[in-house]
């Protein structure tokens, strides 16, 4: 009878250990997958992310918004010319050089405005190039291999049936947590790209104000926001890389309970920090 009880206990322990290791291995595989997916998403340019959406945004920007921006630029240039003429004693002291300077400045503004879409895309090409270079380094240093879990499995083999059952239930809950985290990351990464498209569609309007000292703050702040959104992808990638390294430390710690609940804590921390990356990027570039 004792033999049967021991056999049943050992069989249940093996079953639970296999279930726990399966959950944890799947959990850590999810970490690697998330790092790869985020690196691919935030490292993609707006043109490559979705060709159909990109074409739509370009048409809206160049056919609907650009003519309105042309009117804005006309107002800005006229306002600046009048202001320049009135500065010299109500046109009594007229300097022809100022007219040449105004013509040159207006011509540059028209050239920039007519190429606004390409300039905006160049900003994102630069940021995506930096992100793509960083993604290769980050992915190579955060991969979690199966041999890291060998020590953890040895610890589980020395535990009783009751604690193993509790750990199995907890590890199953963590799997659900990781799926929720995946949804949050999906919303944040895709939301960032949609924000990029929205900012790009209206780009000519703030760019039209850049040539004026008084009104140029609108255009300058837009460019700062543009760089902030572009390099937000870098901050997202850094957050996930830090998370993966912390998870790697859990996997090699040999403490099953700590591994499970540490993963919960780090997952919540990751989601919290991902939502703060936009604000951090804006503070770095001085956008508001």
Regions found by a protein language model. Give the residues of each.
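Membrane-water interface regions at transmembrane-helix termini and the short interhelical loops
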Residues: 81-94, 182-186, 214-215
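Hydrophobic alpha-helical transmembrane segments in multi-pass membrane proteins
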Residues: 67, 71, 75, 79, ...
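Elongated alpha-helical scaffolds
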Residues: 102-105
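Hydrophobic alpha-helical transmembrane segments of integral membrane proteins
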Residues: 165-215, 234, 238-245
């Amino acid at each position: 009878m004792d033999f049967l009880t021991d056999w049943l206990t050992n069989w249940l322990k093996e079953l639970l250990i296999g279930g726990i290791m399966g959950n944890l291995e799947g959990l850590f595989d999810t970490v690697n997958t998330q790092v790869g997916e985020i690196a691919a998403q935030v490292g993609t340019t707006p043109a490559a992310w979705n060709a159909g959406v990109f074409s739509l945004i370009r048409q809206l920007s160049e056919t609907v918004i650009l003519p309105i921006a042309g009117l804005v630029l006309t107002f800005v240039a006229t306002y600046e010319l009048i202001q320049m003429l009135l500065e010299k004693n109500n046109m009594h002291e007229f300097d022809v050089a100022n007219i040449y300077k105004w013509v040159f400045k207006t011509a540059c503004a028209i050239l920039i405005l007519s190429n606004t879409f390409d300039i905006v895309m160049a900003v994102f090409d630069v940021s995506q190039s930096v992100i793509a270079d960083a993604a290769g380094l980050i992915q190579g240093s955060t991969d979690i291999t199966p041999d890291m879990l060998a020590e953890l499995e040895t610890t589980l083999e020395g535990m009783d049936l009751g604690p193993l059952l509790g750990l199995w239930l907890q590890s199953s809950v963590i799997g659900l947590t990781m799926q929720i985290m995946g949804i949050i990351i999906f919303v944040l990464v895709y939301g960032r790209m949609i924000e990029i498209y929205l900012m790009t569609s209206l780009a000519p309007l703030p760019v039209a104000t850049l040539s004026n000292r008084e009104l140029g703050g609108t255009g300058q702040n837009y460019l700062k926001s543009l760089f902030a959104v572009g390099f937000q992808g870098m901050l997202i990638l850094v957050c996930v890389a830090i998370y993966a390294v912390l998870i790697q430390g859990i996997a090699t710690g040999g403490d099953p309970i700590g591994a499970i609940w540490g993963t919960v804590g780090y997952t919540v921390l990751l989601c919290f920090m991902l939502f703060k990356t936009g604000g951090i990027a804006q503070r770095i570039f001085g956008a508001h």
